[in-house]
């Protein structure tokens, strides 16, 4: 059972990503002047170099194969124990002066981990140009996460650039993060999702034109090719989003409103990689593997609860993540997916919990465990080279279920390659408990 307990209503109302990172709704509440080119001036396009070929207005550039990638994945051998994959992901991925983006880039570098950063497109759009954004079923320029200041856009660009160069994935969290009312993303059609995706991509691909800044380097990737998956705001609207994602050739989606710790399958031809229910220490129910869902079960509707609670809550959050990892690693080896936000909720205890959990996992790896901290894209690369019948066999293992007779006998058939298809498999439930859709 997935329980949000008393926090369910709070989670649904605040919708996880928190408006504090932006300027607040559609107004101009952000600190500092937001820019954009003046007088219609078009910024100068960077010239090609030996290492970079500008794309479009030079906001992005082709710089070759992404560095710091794992070796090419191979199929499991007959009887081989699957690796334990762990994916840490971040919704929004804006750097707003709290230093959290570079903090976790440093942590990942220290422990040879790769992550996925689901960038909100409007985080690269100056507020002065907000009317370029035409969100489905919402007023032009509206955004429930606001807009960043000029300085914060520049900081975000700097960290997104660094992230890609260090081997991390840049996905999308789309744009305005609408979770309630008639304009909610949960009501969008496939065509409206396509519009939202096209706009999110344009804000990444045209930040130079929209800002007027000519003194910053290009983002070192082709976003049309880089973008192969995302996570929807509040985990809403996945069914229609999948139609758009499939038509765009996306390889995965991380928007499911709640899953279990089992091996994934495809929906509509797209890998469905959900947040998962994990043990919640001291409670009789489980919680989704995302910082905000843990918060909702601790401080209900407050992101700034009394500090006296913080030490115990930090430990509970840390142990929830470690317990989720251990349950998978010691049993069915299902991939472990963790979602987060660059937020200082309740004194930053959830950021500390993520760091503590990642360090715990890294120590297990250092002891010799076959643990791989990867991005969603890298994990999808591995899935796509496995033989369909091997993945189908893995899906027969339920939550916390060890293979009968050990891995050698369980996967003793032939290995190989091939497309995995849209098989669900035993135990691959969705776990759509109360309030499950509220934490992203």
Indicate where each model-derived feature is located.
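Active-site beta->alpha N-cap acidic-glycine motif
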Residues: 55-169, 176-180, 203, 207-243, ...
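Active-site cleft segment of glycoside hydrolase catalytic domains centered on the general acid/base Glu
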Residues: 180-199
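Short, low-complexity, disordered segments immediately C-terminal to signal peptides
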Residues: 18-46, 423
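Long, low-complexity, intrinsically disordered segments
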Residues: 422-440
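Well-ordered, non-membrane alpha-helical segments in soluble/globular domains
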Residues: 100-102, 149-157, 193-198, 314-323, ...
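N-terminal export signals
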Residues: 1-19
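C-terminal domain-boundary segment and adjacent tail
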Residues: 61-62, 69, 80, 252-264, ...
């Amino acid at each position: 059972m997935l329980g949000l307990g008393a926090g369910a209503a709070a989670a649904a109302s605040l919708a996880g990503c928190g408006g504090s990172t932006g300027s607040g709704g559609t107004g101009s509440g952000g600190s500092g002047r937001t820019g954009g080119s003046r007088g219609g001036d078009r910024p100068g396009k960077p010239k090609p170099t030996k290492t970079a070929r500008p794309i479009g207005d030079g906001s992005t550039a082709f710089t070759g194969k992404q560095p710091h990638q794992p070796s090419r994945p191979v199929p499991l051998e007959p009887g081989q124990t699957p690796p334990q994959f762990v994916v840490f992901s971040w919704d929004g991925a804006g750097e707003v002066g709290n230093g959290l983006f570079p903090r976790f880039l440093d942590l990942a570098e220290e422990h040879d981990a790769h992550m996925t950063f689901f960038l909100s497109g409007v985080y690269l759009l100056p507020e002065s140009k907000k009317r370029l954004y035409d969100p489905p079923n919402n007023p032009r320029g509206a955004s429930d996460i606001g807009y960043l200041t000029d300085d914060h856009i520049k900081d975000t660009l700097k960290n997104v650039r660094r992230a890609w160069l260090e081997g991390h994935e840049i996905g999308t969290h789309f744009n305005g993060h609408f979770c309630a009312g008639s304009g909610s993303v949960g009501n969008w059609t496939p065509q409206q999702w396509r519009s939202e995706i096209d706009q999110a991509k344009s804000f990444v691909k045209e930040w130079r034109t929209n800002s007027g800044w000519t003194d910053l380097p290009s983002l070192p990737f082709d976003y049309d090719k880089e973008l192969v998956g995302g996570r929807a705001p509040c985990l809403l609207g996945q069914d229609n989003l999948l139609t758009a994602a499939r038509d765009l050739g996306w390889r995965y989606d991380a928007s499911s409103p709640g899953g279990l710790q089992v091996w994934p399958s495809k929906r509509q031809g797209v890998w469905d990689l959900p947040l998962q229910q994990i043990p919640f220490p001291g409670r009789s129910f489980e919680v989704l593997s995302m910082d905000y869902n843990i918060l909702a079960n601790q401080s209900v509707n407050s992101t700034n609860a009394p500090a006296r609670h913080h030490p115990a809550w930090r430990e509970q959050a840390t142990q929830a993540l470690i317990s989720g990892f251990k349950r998978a690693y010691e049993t069915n080896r299902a991939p472990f997916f963790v979602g987060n936000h660059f937020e200082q909720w309740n004194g930053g205890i959830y950021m500390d919990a993520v760091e503590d959990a990642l360090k715990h996992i890294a120590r297990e790896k250092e002891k010799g465990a076959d643990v791989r901290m990867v991005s969603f894209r890298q994990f999808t690369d591995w899935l796509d080279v496995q033989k369909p019948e091997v993945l189908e066999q893995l899906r027969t293992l339920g939550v916390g279920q060890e293979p009968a007779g050990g891995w050698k006998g369980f996967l003793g058939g032939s290995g190989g390659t091939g497309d995995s298809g849209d098989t669900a498999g035993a135990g691959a439930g969705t776990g759509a408990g109360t309030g499950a859709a509220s934490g992203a």
